[in-house]
């Protein structure tokens, strides 16, 4: 008998009342990536957890399916920040999966944008990104270098900005003060507003925001914080 393919593999058991072994410390409804992550973290804290799912298998957007001999993913296409084990994203994945989830690096040219007749490759590594953009947009070297220089300060400012927003008011005050002192002045502006301070070339702006779908808002409406975090996330390429 052949082994099941990823698209036919079933994870979990059918719900039956007589199979329950309660009481449970936590009941999680839905076995998508978020539900499974919460379940794994609670379980690691010694909690007794049950995950309930109406589909025949757990996994949500981690599912895949077959059509005409080809296998397709339903959700996650590729993600970044998996190449080095010290990154926060990699440490989180290793924690919730006990380091069992293995990652494969995609090609250095991991994606491609088409803007009119122009083809722009999304490449791995800051130097490669700069070289690709400068070859496509001669005369825009300073704007491209400034844009890449903006990405790191945003990432460094985010812990303070986040804590200032989620902590109770009394505890948040020092973090708000720190955020005002340390955060770059462009942090609370839209993506388009920031990019138009660097260049008036609309095709370059389109290239820099080509992955706007990952944050769900067009550059006119999206926060530059989110844009910069996503751009930095993929700065060293994609992983699967």
Question: Across the structure, where does each feature detected by a protein language model lie?
Answer:
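Extreme N-terminal leader/targeting segments of oxidoreductases
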Residues: 1-27, 44-45
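Glycine- and acidic
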Residues: 23, 176-177, 210-211, 232-240
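N-terminal Rossmann-like FAD-binding beta1-loop-alpha1 element of flavoenzymes
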Residues: 24-51
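Glycine-rich FAD pyrophosphate-binding loop
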Residues: 43-68
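N-terminal FAD cofactor-binding segment of flavoenzymes
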Residues: 64-109
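Short beta-strand to alpha-helix junction loop
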Residues: 86, 182-191, 234-240
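Rossmann-like flavin
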Residues: 116-223
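Residues forming anionic-ligand binding surfaces in small-molecule and nucleic-acid pockets
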Residues: 221-235
């Amino acid at each position: 008998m052949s082994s099941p393919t990823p698209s036919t593999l079933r994870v979990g058991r059918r719900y039956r009342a007589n199979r329950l072994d309660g009481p449970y410390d936590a009941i999680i409804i839905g076995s998508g990536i978020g539900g499974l992550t919460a379940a794994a973290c609670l379980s690691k804290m010694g909690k007794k957890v049950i995950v309930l799912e109406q589909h025949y298998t757990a996994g949500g957007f981690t599912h895949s399916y077959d059509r005409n001999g080809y296998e397709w993913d339903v959700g996650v296409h590729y993600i970044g920040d998996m190449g080095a084990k010290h990154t926060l994203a990699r440490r989180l994945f290793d924690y919730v999966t006990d380091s069992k989830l293995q990652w494969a690096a995609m090609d250095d040219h991991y994606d491609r944008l088409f803007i009119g007749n122009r083809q722009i490759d999304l490449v791995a590594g800051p130097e490669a990104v700069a070289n690709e953009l400068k070859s496509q947009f001669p005369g825009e070297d300073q704007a491209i270098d400034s844009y890449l220089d903006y990405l790191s300060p945003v990432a460094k400012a985010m812990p303070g900005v986040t804590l200032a927003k989620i902590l109770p008011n009394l505890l948040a005050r020092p973090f708000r003060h720190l955020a005002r002192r340390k955060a770059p002045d462009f942090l609370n502006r839209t993506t388009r507003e920031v990019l138009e301070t660097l260049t008036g070339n609309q095709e370059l702006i389109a290239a820099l925001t080509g992955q706007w779908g990952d944050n769900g808002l067009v550059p006119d409406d999206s926060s530059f914080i989110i844009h910069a975090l996503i751009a930095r996330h993929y700065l060293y390429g994609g992983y699967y």
